[in-house]
Structure formats: structure tokens, C-alpha cells
Amino acid sequence: MTQDKSIEPFFLNKVVDKSQLRQLIIWAFRNYGIARASNMADTLKDLGFLYATKAGISLSLEDLRIPPAKNNLLKTTIDLINDTDTKYRKGEITAVERFQKVIDTWNSASDTLKKQVIKYFTEKDPLNSIYMMAFSGARANISQVRQLVGMRGLMADPQGQIIDLPISSNFREGLTITDYFISSYGARKGLVDTALRTADSGYLTRRLVDVAQDVIIREADCNTSKGIVLESMIDNRKTLVSLHQALIGRVLAEDLFNPAGSKLVAKLNTEISPDLANEIISLGISSVLVRSPITCESIKSVCQSCYGWNLAHGRIVDLGEAVGIIAAQSIGEPGTQLTMRTFHTGGVFTGELAQTVISSSDCQVEYPSNIILSDTRTRHGDHAFLVEKDIKLKLLDFNKKQTSLSLVKGSLLFVKHLEYITSGQVIAEYPISNRLITEKAQKAVLADFSGSIYLMDLSVSNIQSEQQTFKNVIKGGVIWILAGHVFSIPYNTQLIISENDFIDENHLIGKTEFVSRYEGRVRILKKKQDFIQDIVIITSSKTYINIDVLTKFYNGYTNHFLITNQQDKFILKTLPNQTIVDQQLIAELITNIYRTNTGGIIKYLDLSVSDKKVDLNSKKDYYDIVDGGYVLWIGEETHEINKDISLLLVSHGQLIDEGTEIVKNIFTNSSGIVDIIQKEGIVREIIIKPGILYPHSKFYDHKSKSRGFLKPGEIISNDLKTDKLVYWEYFYVKNQSYTLIRPVIVYSIPSKTIQFKYSADSFNSHICSLKLVKRIYFRDGERVKSVSGIDIVKTYLIAELNKDSLNLKCTLQLNLDSNNRSISRMRIVTMDKLSLKDENNIASTKDLYTRTRLLVTNNQYIKSGTVVAQTELFSSLEGQVVSIQKNKSSNPRILLITSLDTKVFSINNNQNIKVNINDLIYAGDEIATNIISYISGQVISIRDNQITVRLGQPYLISEGSFLHVNNQALIQRGENIATLIFERVKTGDIVQGLPRIEEILEARKKSDSFFNPHVVLDSKFRQYVNQGLNLYDATRLSLLILQLYLVKELQLVYQSQGVEIADKHIEVIVRQMTSKVKIENGGDTDHLPGEIIELQKIEMLNKALRLASKEEALYYPILLGITKASLNTESFISAASFQETTKVLTDAAISCKLDWLRGLKENVIIGRLIPAGTGFNIYNNMQLNYQDEKYSYTKNLLSLPQNTKNLNFEDIIVDDRNAHMYSRNNNL
């Protein structure tokens, strides 16, 4: 590369992988410029191609080598899990602790296997194709290799919870059906995430760009003395960002001295290069004060010194650089990487294992004197000591060599004072990162078998809610389930057995009787299904012999007509064999007596009607006619139209004939006087009123009404009298008054009933009967708008059911008359139906079976209360009935102890019995000399050299859980006996980072988050104000604390995903989020309370007010999310182009806002040159003058080598180290 012969090249025998290659190219770029670095990258590419094409690397099944250690590892893991299950079965750990232990054991196994895979490839097969691909960075990653040749490991279900059954096989061995289905959750989630989260990532970038697009480097130095302290970022004892990495490209905010002496290392405003950063680290300096965009005092911009290097070029950032856009893209772009990564791993769980401290040799542990410990229980249910403050343990080996071990507060200690430990033993466990968000979760404890409940050492309190009472566990203990067969018996079963009875196989336990509530005739129906027998009890039957039913077929329709002995003809409205309900319409009388030709006005005369009712089918109101009377009908034809009055073909008051066209294509059906109702030139109705117009008579002047009836003999006009009942009303035509006399039709409605006759075989006829009902659908005085006419009164036959028989099924049947086959007879039947299970039907459990016997015969007439059938319940097991429980909320239960529920241990006379009757024993307990019980349970008998133990299962229940059973309760297998409440870490796939980033940047006020930034900002501000700081300083300091926290939080999320982002990018965004304050009191400014304004702007106003001795504005700092910050930007054009366009522009118009076009977006929208890059006007900046610039260029020119003839430039297109140094005066 270089022509300097004094530098000797050195040979380095090392594998150059992806990261080494990156470092090499960065070094070449930083030291030799872009042209030489590009050339070197080109030659490296050629070298790579040369060797890559010498031999093709293929992938075959043989390359997928499974490490031999896998089988032993799986065996060890399964043994550990079996030990955990044994502990659980002995009631030593809870279901939650068992689950956590199983998860952690498999997770640890998966992690160990991953290391074994790497070790195997490295040591045994370094030229393996898959190993070379993965570890050179060409293709795949360690997670994928692990799944190919190690084990797939634990998977997450659709809710994000871990399934405790891992996939122990890999893709090389192949998956079982179970493995495949467990895998499918993550696979689908990966595909969905790829689609959805890509959009989320893009939207995040858009919001970031919008919030920071106006941040441009506008000046060289803001001359601030402020800065931020940089340290290594450490989380959970892991260095995420080293101090060296954080320092490169920064500018010192103070002189830096060697801590060992007073020697100056670097001056104020010195740029920190990699060499200087190395020197700072080598001197042991752990924190450095540097300039930062957060503390920059430039107005509406950032200065060069506070920003530092442009990391792309490795030199100070240029003036006019749009650093806001760069920052937004730097933070937003990795979002896509976070998204895509889930797809590759397919939902494989990557949980955080607690970091354990393992002894490297045999030694003795010694506690320090100041140690403070408290007893605790680990999440696996083991006993441990909780370290209450940071300590140092002494470890003494057998050679008295001493080493120390530091433990932080919150660590778990597993060894006692002066205890001897072996190599590989776990000494302690560091606390899992407290940054993980936990959530309250529930775990149901289900009964593994049926039996009775025994509560041991549990303290319970009742909590009453609106719906039910909960039993809350105050002090933890054990729930025992003592085995037995539990039968749930139907509620109405009559038991034949009692407690302590011994029953044999096929013994009768109880019986259920089916009793008829009604008397009637029995009909045993033909079976439709093999095991169900239907019985019908006909409670009433009524055949009408004075009604003939004629059936007629027309156009595919069947109509049934009823003809009474009075020759009234009805049409049947209910289909035969259809269920009938009370007050159902059965038939309608066919008649035209009450049919009108048109609409009109209806008036009742001596007509008694019921209260208004509603027809459920048509939703119309109707009235039943209670007693006979008359209906008066004043006919009129009403046409409802909505047309302009100019389209009318008739005029108001005109007498027209039938068939007259009143509007185009609308003709009248009757003759009469035209009455036009119009509104604002639009005709609403045209009414044709039959009658005669008479000139106005003084006879009507004394009447207070404008319409009414005239009886026969009353005066119409000028001694003209009426000879019948008529209707009169005032009528105005062209401002002249007339009297319109209209004819009245009188409809007589007599009272009428039908006397029905029944056949001799009818019985219980009072249960259901038919009733003749006349019904009117219009109220008194109602005006019916119609053209064609209506039925004023309709006559129906209605079914009436006895109130006690409403639960019965009622049907209408048509049977052919035996004497005359052309007619049918109508029969109404009511019945009660019983469905009985057949004799051979087996009950839902194999331990019980039933037999059902019919106790009646077909056509038998029975009384109410007769037993129709009996179901008998038999046990298929033999044993002792220990308990019979009855309670109001559930069916009775029987507990039967059989030989299957007990275990007998035989002993001889020489063995001592170590248990008593009713003792509870655990698996592994010694019950007699040299006899170890391999089961848990209760001793129920000791006699004849035999110990009988009833099988049992203890369940450990932790404090705070909810209990669902009572002591001595009987439960069946699979029932929930308790719900454990515990805290768990919120798990998720690898993309969990993206929502967290969004949550921080949007400054969401989440209740379940362990840190609320809004609360912290407010409390810090109040604290500083109370300490006596002025408003500006209190705001600045509280904002600075929050800014540093937000930067760290965002870095933690990205670093945990393996994504590196320079702090300065995040600082630029955070600066925008924290640049505003909210006015509390405007003082003598023009600002109103609640207004959001820039901190720098309000402080300048306050300075001016202070000089003028006026009242200053009061304010407090606020944190705005990126969306809110974008909408609250000074430029309304930028805000409107982002979101809520109408609102933003309306607000700007009302407020008469000005847009100074400072940012990029607003200039692009207007069509101006953007104020960045070449569009940045350097001459407007007073701090930079042409002389300074000229001097710096000249100085740089002088530093160029004078003798350039000896330099070899043939590999350089443009030497970018020198190109930018030429003066503008040079003619290039």
C-alpha cells in the first residue's frame, strides 16, 4: 500500500473472518482514503473469487455432523427433569417452580449443546462446509446451525408462552408429528411478522425523519462549557458499549489529565481519534466529559464541535450536514433487521439464563463479617440465601491459596459459611437483569386423579367479589388428593347405598324415576336412533265434527278451507302438524262484507273494543271487538306524491270523474272533489273526496267545529235537508268558503259465536279450544291513506290454551272422514314428550352404567303422577363407599375406594413399623425397617403383618394463590383445585425490541412499565426547584437526566439485538423530544397557559423581561413522543405534511403563523433549494469568515509533500485526502 520503505511488512497467520475483514477495510479507508480502500476491497474480492472458484463448497447430509456428546447430554437432562418431577410429586415444589425448572434445564441443555456443536466442528472438522459457511459470515448463523445438528430446543406457543416440551431432535434427525405441530406456531408467526413488522419499521423511520429533519450543522462552535460524561455501558455485568467505542469521534469538553500525575493528555475541544481513545483507556480513565448534541447551545441546530466526527468519513462533520436525517435513518434502518430475524429462527425461544458462579476447584467458602443474608426460595423451589448488600466471599483451596468472589445485592448464595465445595459446584447466581418487564400470571393446578381433598398447613381468607367468593391463600401449604373413584350422580337420583357400605361388581347404586306430570294416553313411538326411545303422552284430543275441511290444489300450492254448519267459509292459516301456541291465528273468514273501495276516515259508533295489541308477525296495532256495534266510513282516495305543483293536471276544488289523470300516469279510481295538500310548491297529497260542494250556510257559523256528521232531517244549505247520515266539512276554493257534504257508509258488526261439536273419542277438551274473534286494525277517527281499499274488520279463529298446559306441545291434525273421503276432520291434540335412553346404554364413565325400563304399555291411559320409566344406576367396580357428598351447587358425588386405589406392603415380625394409621407418607419414606415406600399417600390400615396405604398426591400451594376446593371435597381427574399466582418475565420472539423502541420514542405512559419517563422528569424538576435552583437550570438538569436515560434505554434494546448505533444519533432524536416546555403562567409574554414552546425561545424572552423588570413566564419541562414532537414543530408546513393536515393548517391559519422555511421538508414542499449540503449558505454565518477559511486551506496546502514525482498514483482515481484541501482560488 505505502511507498515508505522504512515500514517493513509483517506476516500474520490468522483467519480473516467477516469482522476482521470489516476492520481491515475501515483501517484502509481511515488512513488512505476512499480510492485506495476501494482498490484494496477490489483486490480482496478478486482474491476471494479466485479461491472460491478453485473448489465449490456444496452441502450434503453428511456435512450435518451431530456431536457425539448429544446423547449423553440428553440423558443427563432427562434425569434432571425426572428428579424435578419426583420433587413435584412429593409436594416439595409448586407447579410453577417445576415448570420453570424444566424450562431452564432444557434451555441450559440447548445452550450446552450449541457450545458442543462449535467445539466439535472447531476441533474435529474445521473444513466442514456448514461450519465454514456459518463462521465465515457467508451464510447462516449459529442459531440455524444449532437447529440443523444440535436440537431445535424450546418453542413458544401462539400467546408467546413457552411450551415445556422441547424439540430434542434436529433437522438432520427429523421431526416427529408432535415436534412438527409445535414448530408450526413459530413458523406462522415468523411469516406474519415479516409482513406486518416491516411496515412498523418503515413507519418508525418516517416519524423519526419528520421529527429531526430540520437538525442541520449550522455553525462551527456554540462555545458551550457543558457536556456529558461518557462511561462504558454495562448491563447485567456485560459490557454492551465500551468506553473506547463511545469515545471515537467525540470532542473533549474539558482538558484531560493523567490521573496518575498532572500531565495533560488532551486539550479542551480536541477530537478523539482511535489512537487518543486507546491512550485514554490505557491510562485507566473510566469516565470522560465530552461535547454532545444534547448539551449544544446552538439555536435550532447543532454545532460541529458538539456533534463531532461524521462517522462515515472519520473526520469532523461538514457544515450544512443534515445530521437529523442521518440520525433518523440510523435508528430506523435496524428495525427491519429486527423484523427479519424472527423469520429465520422460526419462533425458537431464546430465554435469558441466570448467570451462575461455578467453583473452578475444590475449596472452602468463608463469609465476610459484614454479610447480611435472608432465607429465600429460588424460582426452582430450592433453598438459598438472598444477599442484601454487595459482599466479597473468600475461597480457600487446600493449599491455603485465597481467591475472592464479588457478589452484588440481589444475588442468590447456595453454600453455607465454612462449607467445603467441589469443583463444578454452583456457588451463587447473579440476579437476572431487572430491565426485563414482569407480568402477573396464573397457573392452574389440575388434579392428576380423582379422590378426596385434604388441606395441610394452609391458611385461607375469603375475598368477596360481586359474583362470587374467592379463597385466597395467606400462608402456603400442601393440598393432598387421596385416591378414590368419584362418581357424579344425577341430581334427582334416589340412592340405595349409604356411607361405609361394601358393594360388589354390578351392584345397584340408585334409581331415577320418570314421572308424568299430566294424565293422558301413552303412545310409544318408533325408534329413530338406536339408543333413544321417545314416549308421547297425549293429554287432550278434540275432533270437530261440525267443521268440514276441504283441500284444494292450485299452481303447486295446497289450501285448506274450513266450512262450518252455518256455511261460513274460513281459510286455514296454520299448517297441519305445526306446533300451535296460545292466541295463535288458526283460520281467517273469507268475506267481502267489510271491504271498502278506497281509503277514508273511520269512526266507531257504539263499538266496544279491547286495549291496543300488537301483531308479532306484521308488527301492526290491532283491537279485538268485544261487543257488537257500528263502524262509520267516510270514503276518500289518497294519492301520496312528491312533485312540483306545476306538474298537476287538476286544480284544487275541481270536480273530477273516475279515471281522470291527475298527474302524468296517475289516474283516479273514483269521482269527487280534488283536495290538494302542498308545502312550499311541492304537492304532498292529492285527495279525491266524493261529495257535493254547497255555498257556505249561516247554519254552520255557530258551530265550534270545522267538520262533523249530519243526521237525517238536518239542514245542509238554504232549506235543503239531508235524508240520510252524511259528513260535512269546510272547504276553501280560491279564498271562497264552501261546505262539502260527503256520503257515509254504515257497517254493522253484530256479536257472533260458533257452537263447536266434538267426536265421542275426544277427551280433556278444556285444555285447548277455538274462539271466534273479530279484529279491527284501525283506531277510532283514524284517516286511512289508500287508493285501492281496505278490510275494516277481519274475522279469525284463534287457539286458546289452558294456562296450566302452556308447556305442552299442541298441534293441529287433519284426518279423512271415515264416512265421506272427500272431506277431512280437524283434530287438535296436546301432548307431553319424554326421551328415554335405551336399556343397554352405557353412562359417560366406564365405572358406572345404566339400564332404563319402561313401566307403561302403548295406548295405556295414565293418571298424573304415574311412573312411566325407571333408570337404574349400577357400579362396575367393587369397593367401599367412603363418602357421599351433596351440595346445592353441583350434583351429588360418591367416593368409592377400590383395590386399585390402595397399595399393600407386607412385613414380617422382625421389622419395626414406623408409621401410624392416618399418617401421610411421601414417596421415599421408610414405613418399616428396610421397607421404603415408592408411593405417596395415607396409611389406612395396619394389621395381619400388612400396611395398607391409600394412594395420594401432594401439591405444594404458594402464598397468594387462589383455592377452588374445600377440605374433604370430592373431585374428579382434571378438575382445577387451585390457581397459582406468580410473576414471570414477558417473553417474546427476537422482534420484541421493535415495540419497545417505539414505546420509548413515543414516550408512552405505560402503567405496567418499570420506568415511567414522564414521572421521573416531573419529580426531578420539582426536586431541583425545591432545592432553590432557578427555573432554567432546574429544567435543563431534569431534562439532561431524562435524556441520558432515554439514550441508554434505546441503546440497551439495540445492543441486546446485536445492532450497533452511535450514541450521537440517538442524542439528536432525544434532543428534539426534550426541546419543548409547557407554559404554566405567561407572565408579561403573549403566551397562554398550556402552550408548548421551545425552551431556548422562552428563556430568551425571559431574559428580555428580566432586563425590563417585568414578570417572567413560568413553565415546566415536558417529554414529547416523536409523533407529538413532529406535530408541534415550528414549521406548520412540515407538521401538516406529516399527519392531521386539516387540523394543523386550520390552527396555523387561525393563529396567523409564519413559516421561516428552516428545515428540509418545508423547502422541498415549497420548491426551494434545501438548506443542507450545497444549499447551506456558509456566508450567512458570522462565525466563519473567508479569511479563516483561506488560512486553513493554505495551511493544509503547505502540508502536502513537495516532491510528488516519486509517488505512485496509478492505482488512484482521485486522491481524496488532498482534493478537499485545494483553495477556491486555484484553477483546477
Curated annotation (Swiss-Prot):
It comes from the Eukaryota. GO terms for molecular function: DNA binding; DNA-directed RNA polymerase activity; zinc ion binding. Zn(2+) binds at residues 222, 296, 303, 306. Its cofactor is Zn(2+). One of its GO terms (cellular component) is DNA-directed RNA polymerase complex. Pfam families: RNA_pol_Rpb1_3, RNA_pol_Rpb1_4, RNA_pol_Rpb1_5. The keyword Zinc applies. Binds 1 Zn(2+) ion per subunit. It catalyses: RNA(n) + a ribonucleoside 5'-triphosphate = RNA(n+1) + diphosphate. Belongs to the RNA polymerase beta' chain family. RpoC2 subfamily. DNA-dependent RNA polymerase catalyzes the transcription of DNA into RNA using the four ribonucleoside triphosphates as substrates. NCBIfam families: rpoC2_cyan (TIGR02388). This is DNA-directed RNA polymerase subunit beta''. The lineage of its organism: Eukaryota, Rhodophyta, Florideophyceae, Rhodymeniophycidae, Gracilariales.
